[in-house]
Amino acid sequence: MNKDLTDLYHHKAEEMSTMLVSLRNRSRVFILTEIGSFLVAIGFVVLYTLLDNAAWTLFCALAALLFYLYIRRRDVLNDRKIKTAEALQRVYQNEIDYLNGNFSGFEAGEQYVNPQHPYTFDMDVFAAGSLFQRMNRTISTGGSDQLAACLSTEWGSAKREELIRQIRQRMVSVDELGKAEPFLSEFKSLGVKERINTEEVLKALTDVHRQSFPKFFHNPLLRYFCYADLLGFYVSIVLSVMGLAPSLLPLWWGIFNFMFSFLCGHKHMRVISELIAKVHTQVDGYLRVLKLVNKTEFKSAELQALKQKLAGAEESFEQLELILQKIDNRSNEVGVFVFNSFALIDITIVRLFLRWQHTYEQRTNEWIDSLNLFDALVSMGNFRLNEDRAVQAEISEENKVVYEAKNLYHPFLSEKAVANDFTIHDHEYYIVTGANMAGKSTFLRSLGINYLLAMNGLPVFADHLKVSLFHLFTSMRTTDDLTHGISYFNAELLRLKKLLGSLRDDVPSLIILDEILKGTNSLDKLNGSRLFLQYIAERNVTGVIATHDLELSKMEEEYVGRFHNYCFEIELGEDITYSYKITKGVARNQNATFLLKGILNPNRI
């Protein structure tokens, strides 16, 4: 556990706690002051009715009312600070829990679990305690989907150069965000109270863009007519006050404005109100994210490009907020009459909406996609910050399987994890034997999950790891499916069939298998495993296979230079000693009988 980082999170959480005490005390003072100033204003109004020549009391009442409005504004701002501090306190506490091994405060990504995926099911990428849950700090459903998509990518495409360039760019982005702690916490705090529902936003924005209005509102002459009408209206007021025009002229003109604007625009304005109201809270969340991103300077090419793609988004969402504010201003009968008479507000709202629709129709989806990626990158950067024991991998450009690891271990294990050196050569196969619980499966998962991290530009858990770009497929956790009448053995065959179907001769592949054909008898399992490995060895494939079948290790003698034996050995004595170190050779000791004797006769052990 990173003690310095833990101390930092504790310090920040305590700082927020102290700030909250101060802000809440201030809030109570503001409330009492608001009540007092409002009562004082009423008192001066009462004095005005009781005293003669008491015009001064009206000025005092006005002053008290202005003071009330000032304090009210301060109270609103103070309340925002309280909400921000509460959110940050929750963020810091969540990170403290994470460093202590408690991930319950983060979504596990159960919806992304897919037993048919080439590797995510076997590598514990999703579900409780998974890599996703440890990494996920997204504040939007779209960001969560984007992070899941990154962790589920199937590599090995023919566009190797472009993919390698993107991975290296991602490494720089992740490293930069991993050092941007104040930014990370502030970003994460924006999703504490309520996550942004990206699907709802996209659906509502689609409805917004599809909404059509009569050609009348698109006519440029309408704009000039409105300008001329309002100019004439205000001039009539001035002339009426000066006695140069009939006193009723402004009144009748105002009534005309109200009728014209209300009858022409009210129905359409209500449609706009309903459309925008659907996304108001979500858009407000995106607006806060955009303000934070836009005020932050980034150095990496990927982050700068993302920020550039978001140009205009903040202004766009602010305009939506402005339209909604104008709708709120005319939300009662008095507002409807006043704002339509003096500003033709219903027509103005429709025209503002049309202008927004025309200006930003083609860009909103791109902005949402960019924000989703930014959201996912913040989670990756936060993982980089928390896991400072990890290092960035070296990406090889060779068009073959390259996997050279120095002191590699599984990221889910503590810092006391036993690390292993291991090198995988292209077109070669590694048979790993060993007793139960000796470390075979954990080692296989260490190979797979660290490759997954490297391909996403994330730090790996090793002193050094050099990998190339290749297709990864695993078969470690096959399950039966009684609902569809699929037995365990049949499920294994289907998994191997899917493996074969995923292979391409022009793309190097690494397969990681744990106990092939577990669902059959020992001899059949051995013969079937040999047959499968003999066939697969003719393809552009490299493999690491864990097995209890010691006979399978004889393939090293039959295919010299192609098959290699490695093992996790145990020492049997009064107790069992597990080294968890991989060595060359074939395992000599097994522990099933030893452990079973301990269960049947506990006094023996």
Question: What is each of the regions a protein language model found here?
Answer:
Residues 380-383, 387-605:
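ATPase nucleotide-binding head domains, primarily ABC-like/P-loop NTPase cores
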Residues 1-435, 443-472, 494-495:
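Alpha-helical coupling/stalk and coiled-coil linker elements that connect catalytic or binding modules
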